[in-house]
Amino acid sequence: MATNYIFVTGGVVSSLGKGIAAASLAAILEARGLKVTMLKLDPYINVDPGTMSPTQHGEVFVTQDGAETDLDLGHYERFIRTKMTKRNNFTTGKIYSEVLRKERRGDYLGATIQVIPHITNEIKSRVIDGAAGHDVAIVEVGGTVGDIESLPFLEALRQLAVQVGRERTLFMHLTLVPYIPTAGEVKTKPTQHSVKELLSIGIQPDVLICRSDRMVPPNERAKIALFCNVPERAVISLKDVSSIYQIPALLKSQGLDDFICQRFHLDCPEADLSEWEQVLYQEANPTGEVVIGMVGKYTELPDAYKSVNEALKHAGLKNRLSVQIKYIDSQDVETKGTEVLEGVDGILVPGGFGNRGVEGKILTAKYARENHIPYLGICLGMQVAYIEYARNVAGLTDANSTEFDRTCDYPVVGLITEWQDAEGNIETRTDASDLGGTMRLGAQQCHLMEGSKARELYGAETIEERHRHRYEVNNVLRPQVEKAGLKVTGLSADKKLVEIIEVPNHPWFVACQFHPEFTSTPRDGHPLFAGFVKAAKDNQKK
């Protein structure tokens, strides 16, 4: 079957939840037996978000094949079973970079390179490539209609709709319908103006998703339909909800999936949302609560840890617990002391870069180890736990990472200069390598040691998890740290890189070099997070 395309745009203001709405629609269509994929087109000029500040952009989501992508791809993977790849996210910077590379190579035979047709053709070709092999491809355009940055993407999608045929394409526009308390009613004018903006560039939306803090009344929906040239049944109300996992059922209750299947002439069964109903039941009926202290350096923007936040919630679902996250700035641990860590049932130190606040993270690992508080370290969270153990248990008092101190006496963590990728190829890096796109990225195999907590949790000898780092445990000094009692319980496929460590004689102290949050989903959870949250609950009984 030829691929059908749903193009998702946003209007009026940003941050309305295009990604969540698109992923929720994808979940319904997948529940109808369709093979669905999703793409995100980002208008910024960065080649990828890998070097962007987490406090500006939010987290960088890493795909199975090692692409550093927008956090919306994390939403996509949490809502549907399809795994995202480097083909599912591209930016203006990546498009221009490829077009310029082709021009230098002579592919355009001396033509004058222009936005139309060369940039738009490259966009179309990447959309078609990313959608190949699926029944439905949902393509989200970042930004807001009217932004100058998104114009080439919108023009490319307009052309693609003409070339593929309108019977196989659908434009879905998400817009704001604000409630004005002084007037006591919702206002449709912003939506009308947003659609007018879209029409001015040649795109007539087929479906309107109306974001509001309440359900849009029938009269206003009819008004929007009339003035925006959209069937009334295609004006969908999307109100604020307490959980994003309620949205698939909310969209289905208004017949959005039926409208789309009829539009594409798809003969498929009704959506079976029983798995999502189970998720909502678990979420609404917890048997207890745990408080997790997340100690990081980007805590002013929780979206910087989006996948970690969601993975903790998923672990709560698996344990029938409500998980409350207490965000703690690691610099506060340095300046105010470990008192700021009191009152939590478990401590999680997520990934990060740079030396700001790192001593606070090391103090946090020490506090968790000495006070027998469940600890989960991820990426840098493993490295600081290793440094802390080396300093305070193994007696290597000046132990550090060369990322933070190049002249320390005991560089127990250092730059990885060589590693084996998932395909078995050897990759190399040096201090002179570029900052962007030079980390150990994507899924890598890990061998778990017999008798370890990690082996017990995963129930397997070999696992595969995603990485994003350029520093690792220094094997030269590793014997001294292990001799002091620290257990290395996970190693890379070639046995050269430390992937998991555990502290013995502790209720639950596990730290990993990889990012388990990227593979956690609301339906399946993740064994490390589930084990950590259970240990946090058990800690309350002490």
From Swiss-Prot:
Q: Which organism is it from?
A: Pasteurella multocida (strain Pm70)
Q: Which PROSITE patterns match?
A: GATASE_TYPE_1 (PS51273)
Renumbered residue ranges of the record's region Amidoligase domain: 1-266
Q: Which residues bind Mg(2+)?
A: 72, 140
> Protein name, please?
CTP synthase
Write down the top EC class of this protein: ligase
Give me the gene this protein comes from.
pyrG
**Amino acids binding L-glutamine:** 352, 380-383, 403, 470
Please state which protein family the record places this protein in. Belongs to the CTP synthase family.
Q: In which pathway does it act?
A: Pyrimidine metabolism; CTP biosynthesis via de novo pathway; CTP from UDP: step 2/2
Report the active site residues.
379, 515, 517
**Activity regulation (UniProt):** Allosterically activated by GTP, when glutamine is the substrate; GTP has no effect on the reaction when ammonia is the substrate. The allosteric effector GTP functions by stabilizing the protein conformation that binds the tetrahedral intermediate(s) formed during glutamine hydrolysis. Inhibited by the product CTP, via allosteric rather than competitive inhibition.
